[in-house]
Amino acid sequence: MNRRRFLGRLEAASAAAIAGAIGLPLSGCLGFHYVNATLVGNRLVIRQEEFGREPFVLVDAPGQALPLYVYRHSDGSYTAVSTRCMHLGCQVEPTAGHLVCPCHGSEYTNDGRILKGPTPLPLRKFPVLVDGERILIDLSAEAS
C-alpha cells in the first residue's frame, strides 16, 4: 500500500469515527417524544393522545429551563416531574423505565423518587389532574 492510499483510508476511518462519536450520544435524544403544551393560567395543558403508545412524553413548558417528564402509569394516572437533577442541575434522561442523570449517575423512578445517588433530593414533582382528554399540570405548586 502506498502512502497516498494509506492516508486516504486513514482519513475515511477518522471521519467515520468522528461521525459515530457525535451521532451515538445524539441518537438517544432523537427517540424522545417531545410535545408542546398550552399554558392556561398556571397550568400546562396537554392532550392524552399526545402519548400515543409511549408511556411518557417530554413537555416543553413555558418558563421552565428544562422540559417536564410526564409519565403515564399502567392504572391511567399521570406523574409530572422536572428533568433537572437535584444534585448539580443537569438534565436527566429517560432510559429503561427510569430517569438517569448523565453527569454523575443519579437515578430516579418515573415518579421522581431516588433510586441511586449522589443526588440528595427527589426530582421536583408537579400536581397532575386529568380532565376528560386533557392532562393539566399545575406549575405553581409542588405535589406531595
List each language-model region with its residue ranges.
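N-terminal secretory signal peptides and thylakoid transit peptides that target proteins
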Residues: M1-A21, P25
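Short alpha-helical basic/polar micro-motif
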Residues: R4, T83, N110
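Preference for short coil/turn "hinge" residues that link or interrupt alpha-helices
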Residues: A19-I22, L39, L44, C101, ...
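Short amphipathic alpha-helical segments with coiled-coil-like heptad repeat character
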Residues: S14-I18, E93, P120
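Exported/periplasmic cell-wall-interacting domains
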Residues: E107-Y108, R113-P120, R124, V130-G132
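N-terminal pre-ligand scaffold of iron-sulfur
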Residues: G28-T95, P122-S144
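Structured, soluble extracytoplasmic/luminal domains of envelope-associated proteins
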Residues: G89-K116
